Every structure is written in C-alpha cells, then in structure tokens.
Curated annotation (Swiss-Prot):
Keywords: Cell cycle, Cell division, Cell inner membrane, Cell membrane, Cell shape, Cell wall biogenesis/degradation, Magnesium, Membrane, Metal-binding, Peptidoglycan synthesis, Transferase, Transmembrane, Transmembrane helix
Cofactor(s) needed for function: Mg(2+)
Location in the cell: Cell inner membrane
A single GO molecular function term of this UniProt record: phospho-N-acetylmuramoyl-pentapeptide-transferase activity
Group of enzyme by EC: transferase
Cross-referenced NCBIfam families: mraY (TIGR00445)
Enzyme Commission number: 2.7.8.13
Protein name: Phospho-N-acetylmuramoyl-pentapeptide-transferase
Membrane topology, record value: Multi-pass membrane protein
Family: Belongs to the glycosyltransferase 4 family. MraY subfamily.
Length: 359
C-alpha cells in the first residue's frame, strides 16, 4: 500500500525510498515486530480468559506437566502481524504476494479450527487428521493452479534443479500434484516440529529469511544473470512478506521463549509451514526448501518411519516421535534440544543459500 507513495516523489525526497524493496522490507519487519510486542500480552490475556484450561498437553515427561494451562492459538499474533506488515508495505498488485498470503491464511484457518476443537473439548483430539489433510490438499490444488498461471510461460510446470546451470525439468501434468505435496508437506512438517518452547518458530524464521533472500535474488534480472539462475519477475516482493514473518515471529518468540506464556498452536504452525511451501513454489526453489527446511523434513520423516516400522514389526525405531522427543527421552534438556535444533537450521540455511552460487 505504502509503495504508491513513491508516485509523490520528484526523485530526490523521502517518498522515493518507497520504490525500494529493501526499504519496504525493513518497514515490514519493524511494523510486525512492534505489533507483536504491543498486542502479544493482550492476546495472551484474552486467550486465558476465553480458554482457561489452555492447550491439552501430550504426556512426554515430568517437564511437560508444568505446561498445562498454557494458552494456544498464539499463531494469531504472527498471522495478524505479518498480514498487516505485508498489506502496508508490499505492492498489492503483485500476484505472488496474494498467493502466499492466501495459502498462509487458509492453512491458518485449518489450524485454528483444530485448536478450537481441542480447547473447547479440553482434549488433544481436534479435527480429524484426514479432514485436515483433505482440506489442505484442496487449498494446495488451488495454489498450484494459480502458480502455474502467474509464472512466466517458460517456467510454468517446470522444476528448477539447484546447483546445475539453467536446468529445468518439465513436469507437465505432474507439476500440480507435486506442488500440492510441497505445500501440504511443508505445513504438516512444521506442525510436527512445534512440540517444544521456541523450537519451531526460530527455524521457521531462518527458513523464511533464506527464502526471502532467494525470492529477492530471482526477482532481479541482474542477480539472476550473475548467479545463472532462472528469472521470476515479481518474486522480490516476497522479501517483504518474509520480513513481516520474521518480525512477527520475533514478537511471538518474546512470549514463547521458555517457559512459554503462549503456544502458536496449529493456527501458527500450519500457516507458517504453508507459507514456506508457497514461497518455494513461487520462486521455483521447491528442492532448496527441502534443504533449508531440512529440520522439518527430519521431524516428519521420523514420524513416518516410526509409524511404518511399528506397524511392520511391532517395534520402534525412536524412543518417541517426532525426533525432538526422542532426544528428550535420551536425557537432553528441553533448552538443549531447542538450541541445537536452531543451530542445525542455521547450517542448513547457509547450505541452501550456497546453492545459489554453486553452479
């Protein structure tokens, strides 16, 4: 919205700054951060009044018993902060901005319904997993069709291969189901990761920051020529979305830091995971998402392996899944698990960024 202030510029005044994506990304970051700081505590108070029992806690160990009564749905704070920041600072005539916002809010609503079902029944059983997956795939199907439509014709239905120069794999009709798997898989992988105080939000912010840099790079023809990557005009505006996500995420982390005063719930985890998947699709960096979000992949794979192996043999591979609970069972303190997983996320993000140059 504020982008249009640049039309008031004569070329040498403050209004000219609104032309620049980097300036507006900074504005989005601070807008979301300040919003989170201001409205975080009022939201927590409102959630405590509305849902006195808080989120039902899975019985993992004695350390988790103290979390009973902690309010959930804190993802609403992140969603509101990043949406306000994006609507204020991004170009609203950009289809990628609306695509990512739409996916984020649709998955946020799926998560909200699940959170509401849990707290209203005071049960860890929310909306059926099959129902959530079905709705998620419908949303992702719509996103895939829109992405194929808004991408340049030479990139539509193409899968970019990292490291290799200008290598695109034409997926044809398989592109749509592939995108559906990327978005739904990303949403649910982040959801599985959100099991400890602060565990999910920092890796999400790291991944978002990395994808934001990639979106900015592939949205500039000079950068793509230098890096030998495909050019996707318009994706640079997604840097503003990711900046708002990071600002809102930090505002949320202020209250989610151990011991957490609020959980993001499925409202936040599904929304943020869906957002990461949508950004990867828009920028044609779906494979890089698997690297940058490798922690989320590991969490999801640990659950799949645990379930399949148990059904086949009656035995477990891990002491408990997702894998962060396995390390808790091994004797790691919760802060150890969280911070070590943050470090892993940062390393994976650097590897993901390196794929831009390693060609």
């Amino acid at each position: 919205m504020l982008y249009w202030l640049n039309e008031l510029s004569d070329g040498g005044d403050v209004f000219n700054l609104f032309r620049y994506i980097t300036f507006r990304a900074g504005g989005a970051f601070f807008t979301a951060l300040i919003f989170g700081f201001i409205f975080g505590q009022p939201l927590i108070n409102a959630l405590r009044r509305k849902y006195k029992d808080g989120q039902p806690i899975r019985e993992v160990g004695p350390a988790h018993e103290t979390k009973a009564g902690t309010p959930t749905m804190g993802g609403l704070l992140i969603l509101a902060a990043l949406s306000l920041a994006t609507l204020l600072w991004a170009r609203l005539d950009n289809p990628y901005v609306w695509l990512v916002l739409g996916v984020t809010w649709c998955f946020g609503l799926i998560g909200f319904a699940d959170d509401w079902a849990k707290v209203s029944r005071n049960s860890s059983a929310g909306v059926s997993g099959k129902v959530r997956l079905a709705i998620g795939f419908v949303v992702a199907f719509g996103a895939a069709l829109i992405a194929a439509w808004v991408h340049p014709e030479e990139l539509s239905n193409q899968l970019a291969m990292p490291v290799f120069k200008d290598v695109l794999l034409n997926m044809g009709w398989m592109y749509v189901p592939f995108v559906m798997i990327v978005i739904v898989g990303s949403a649910n992988a982040v959801n599985l990761t959100d099991g400890l105080d602060g565990l999910a939000i920092m890796p999400v912010m790291i991944a978002a920051g990395t994808l934001g840099v990639i979106a900015y790079a592939v949205g500039r023809v000079d950068f793509t020529d230098y890096l030998d990557v495909h050019y996707v005009p318009g994706t640079g505006e997604l840097l503003i979305f990711t900046a708002g996500l990071i600002g809102g995420g930090l505002g949320f982390l202020w209250y989610n830091a151990p011991p957490a005063a609020v959980f993001m719930g499925d409202t936040g985890s599904l929304a943020l995971g869906g957002a990461l998947g949508a950004i990867a699709v828009c920028t044609k960096h779906e494979i890089v998402l698997a690297i940058v979000g490798g922690l989320f992949v590991a969490e999801a794979v640990s659950v799949i392996v645990q379930v399949l192996y148990f059904k086949a043999t009656g035995k477990r591979v891990f002491l408990m899944a997702p894998i962060h609970h396995h390390f808790e069972k091994k004797g790691w303190a919760e802060p150890q698990v969280v911070i070590r997983f943050w470090i892993i996320s940062l390393i994976l993000a650097l590897i993901g960024l390196a794929t831009l140059k390693l060609r």
